[in-house]
């Protein structure tokens, strides 16, 4: 089954476990003659790489990506692009006692229920490490979008809340996002959040967060009714990021409190929209406005506080997780969210070309 | 492209416009030898049917479903099941002036941007009418789940909020849901909500809402990492319901404020879980707990209040929508949400059979 | 599962049994703004319709197609196109004794082995009647190809052999194909073949045949390595026609006897090819030459000669089939082959647009 | 697009070019808890490996496969299995003059027409080298079939004809296949064929061939009507092998000459079939009889005889191919055919489990 693939025409299949020899992905359907080299991908991986601040896991790996196929003399050939990162820092001894007991809130029990076996080393396939390949694929999607749509395409994400604290949207500054290790767009939130994270880390606990991702410069017409909706695909993509429990497009849950005249974005010739409650998508199709998605991500289950659980044999036990863990996985979800947005948009761009491109 | 299909193994393809001769769907992959007749489907359609209370559109149609293939002597044969409902009440004259102008907040402009053509009669393909076929497909999914899993499977939804007012969860009563025309589980909310809806309707306006859907009695092991996640598929399915702008699983957005020890559901032998913050899904795989999804749905864009807009020719105009419309599309989204949940679960059950069923 | 669909981007899903109320198909992915009406489809159905000569089944039905969705004011809208034909002549009494015994060479035993149930009326889903919807879908594919590629597209098939007799290729005349009831391109073969068929019919027997289908006027670049090969898709499409047991592209099985210098088609500037051993496809991709496929179709299993068989209960029995049957199903496979070729090409055209269309 | 994948539930995606750093594949959907190690795969690769006799290309590589994911402690985990073989012998200088001119009969011109770029080193993606990964995937499919169906599953292929000479079927001996370097089942054909191949090789030419592949011990019920037919999938899989131009199931093209009573396989209680004209498949579904497929493969286009062609710039030129090439690619197609058969059957086995497994 294609459970490890996403996208229909820009199709990404990822493979690999946290502590196996390598992780990788295959991108099938990328158009030919795009300029692509490892230099287009590596910077995005570097952004996501752990060990860069005290707020992400201390696992240290170069995460050096290699292009193994699909590129010739600096250009894509239209054949599958295989990307691989070798795992170099695999301190699997840290995870020894995890082999026989389940972490509450973690996927390990669900894997065992389904498969009757799991690679427990570092979370195996459920590790956030898998998201490195999403970031790599997203980098290729960015090249595709830049080449086919134009330099004006911008896909950016930011951390907008943590532990119940949220930014002041009026202070949103995209440049600030690049300046602090939390990808926070509100300079005044950075200090308090760093203090909160330090305290969480000291407690051996973890904390939830919210992330917003915005795509600008995309054409109208991406997406399709009724089950090929751009917002439905984005919702699936964002909900598929490890730990995400809620997803919004545009005004999101706030629409529940609105009346029709408050929610409808007035249209002026252009077309120009006087507001963007819709988050750039109507009827599942992009309108040319910024595409806005938002999600909440739970606190990681790997904490030092003991929680009641059971062993594989079904006996009661208390579980706490030693080892290196992010106190807030929302931080590293920021580059992943951008990458997933880029992949979904690249996919829908090709889908639109296929069906509707002929008469333009 | 398969934009009008959902599901991989229990695959539903819908077709039809609001004011065409009929709407229908084809279900491919349904197992053979399930007892199925129109009587298994019709009651669910009757629940969703418009015109039953003053809070839903006054379009009156019997919505009589016909099984055109795939069933022989009262049993499914394993071949595609074709379902059809004829459109009998198509007062298309109501929509005449909509042909040349766009309703702010409506899909019509997006369809035109993408396709350069749209069937403007009653919203065409973007009409909520299409969801009748989801309900029909959901009824078949229920038969599948009941037969393969057991009578204990329950998939139920309820209206949990409207216009910013929410139910008191402590008063949740599933029986109440069947007793009031709003599918509200809190008897004390019904009166005030009916009053609110009357006022909204009198104003020619509309209002947003929230819906919760719960599936019980399902086995552990449905879903898959990493892009076949049950929660990701549910998120896509719910976000694909007309007007939905936000989706949650389990605690949803509330997780952003939680610490790891608050979020993790403790596990006791069984396994039993002491709480259900996860909404029945860990790592994209069901755990056997109730599966809980929630979504927010925007106020419909068809309102009597004039909103600035443009014509197809790009000229400024004010638009207001005459005709028959639901003041709160969240109400009729309740049976649709149940149906989508049923379809997603049926699909994942078959997917699990395929990959993991062999050794059980 | 999508077992009743074919095509990826021009996606056709068929449904319906021989003796159910109707048969139909849904075409998903058709581009918008193609001029389409029932008049574009009906003539192709009329060509295939049974009862037109003494060499095809005497079942008489108008096979009147209805477009139920996806077309508005004479143009496709980009939404799914639903086509339906009502079954009007369903003399199911003819098939009564078939319910409990298996016809040697027929699909009925295989269906029962797989599904544990089958709709035995007229072959149910395995009936050649299903191919009417392929012809209908093929007619839409022709409109697509004509609109997107040009009027020069020609997709034609002919009966090239019957019962071991073959045409003389030097007498091939496409006009002759339309003049005789066998779709035979060689005027001198028609008489002897009619005599053979009369004798076969008198004997209550049936006979095998070969069909060749040729597509001209298509661009180079359709298809893809390695599992999206145009020839592999054509082979699957042709082998999927009821009764087909062998498929060839270009020189087909004759290549087994050739040396490299005999098989290679020399290339001149243009590019022009000095011959077409390849059948218009190299490496799975079209070259702009005529695309040539050929297949062999077995004699139908419905014959008056008794053959040893068993009942559903596993008891020995002799089976002979009364009722109306084609003495040579190869004849009616001719329009079906054209339709499948058209659908495969339409699909690959859209696939090529998606991936490679951007820079052209 | 998923052009580089095959299978729906046992899904194989291959990547890599002849002269890139490596080739590989990802298998998604393999059931968990199958015993699998590199030792299960390597022997099949060794069978296919070039350089083992004077009749296959002299490229010498160990073709050492590595499992990079999806296996833990000797068992599959249900997550994607990534396999990789490093390319170690990449004498790309041999192919230098191929960069600017097209080989008649080769895929290079078609790739250029489609993509506007091609990796000309050793045929790039169109190289037979890609088939190594099919053999590797086939080895995993064999493990799946052996585990889920039983030790009785046998999937074997043999070279049945070369240059117009064919074996005597009455001398068919599966043991002989393993004894000669041509995989020929007829001991008396081996000598003359070796002489023919020596002469072909001396001439710098190449020759066509036929291959037959037989699967035994499989259950009835694999496949599905109407577009999920087992024979249609096999036809697509076989036609997708490099150079294949014709495919047959069972009696294949011979059916064109048969009458109904000659073609129908009589059925006795069991069910037992008195003959196997059908090749083990009726109505697209397996019957439990041996599944028999056959194909013709063209002579490779890489020959020393000059053939008229053009350069990339469209100028006339004569092309002959230096370098290491198989005089008869049919020989190395034998293990590839077995592998494709195994993959298709594994896929259909899982598909059957999904839909029909519930009541057994």
Curated annotation (Swiss-Prot), chains A, B, C, D:
Name of this protein: Chorismate synthase
Cofactor comment text: Reduced FMN (FMNH(2)).
One of the Pfam families matching this protein, by short name: Chorismate_synt
EC number assigned by the record: 4.2.3.5
Function field: This reaction introduces a second double bond into the aromatic ring system.
InterPro entries for this protein: Chorismate_synth, Chorismate_synth_AroC_sf, Chorismate_synthase_CS
Organism: Gluconobacter oxydans (strain 621H)
Record-linked NCBIfam families: aroC (TIGR00033), PRK05382.1 (NF003793)
Biochemical pathway: Metabolic intermediate biosynthesis; chorismate biosynthesis; chorismate from D-erythrose 4-phosphate and phosphoenolpyruvate: step 7/7
Molecular functions per Gene Ontology: chorismate synthase activity; FMN binding
Residues annotated to bind NADP(+): 48, 54
């Amino acid at each position: 089954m294609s459970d490890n693939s996403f996208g229909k025409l820009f199709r990404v299949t990822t493979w690999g476990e946290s502590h196996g020899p390598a992780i990788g992905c295959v991108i099938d359907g990328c158009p030919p003659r795009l300029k692509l080299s490892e230099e287009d991908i590596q910077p995005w991986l570097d952004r996501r790489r752990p060990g860069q601040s005290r707020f992400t896991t201390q696992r240290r790996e170069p995460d050096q990506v290699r292009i193994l196929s699909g590129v010739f003399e600096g250009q894509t050939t239209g054949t599958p692009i295989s990307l691989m990162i070798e795992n170099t820092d695999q301190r699997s001894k840290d995870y020894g006692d995890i082999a026989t007991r389940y972490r509450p809130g973690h996927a390990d029990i669900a894997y065992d229920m389904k498969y009757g076996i799991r690679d427990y080393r570092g979370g195996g396939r459920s590790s956030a490490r898998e998201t490195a390949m999403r970031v790599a694929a997203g980098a290729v999607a960015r090249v595709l979008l830049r080449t086919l749509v134009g330099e004006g395409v911008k896909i950016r994400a930011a951390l907008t809340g943590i532990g119940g604290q949220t930014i002041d949207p009026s202070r949103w500054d995209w440049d600030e996002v690049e300046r602090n290790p939390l990808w926070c767009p509100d300079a005044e939130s950075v200090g308090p959040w760093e203090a909160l994270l330090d305290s969480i880390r000291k407690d051996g606990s973890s904390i939830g967060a919210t992330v917003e991702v915005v795509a600008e410069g995309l054409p109208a017409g991406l997406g399709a009714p009724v089950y090929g909706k751009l917002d439905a695909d984005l919702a699936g993509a964002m909900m598929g990021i490890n730990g995400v429990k809620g997803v919004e497009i545009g005004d999101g849950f706030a629409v529940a409190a609105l009346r029709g005249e408050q929610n409808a974005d007035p249209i002026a010739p252009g077309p120009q929209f006087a507001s963007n409650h819709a988050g750039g998508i109507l009827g599942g199709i992009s309108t040319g406005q910024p595409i806005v998605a938002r999600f909440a991500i739970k606190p990681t289950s790997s904490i030092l506080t003991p929680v009641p659980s059971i062993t594989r044999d079904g006996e009661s036990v208390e579980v706490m997780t030693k080892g290196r863990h992010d106190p807030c996985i929302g931080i590293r979800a920021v580059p992943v969210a951008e990458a997933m947005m880029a992949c979904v948009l690249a996919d829908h761009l090709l889908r639109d070309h296929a069906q509707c491109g002929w008469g333009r």
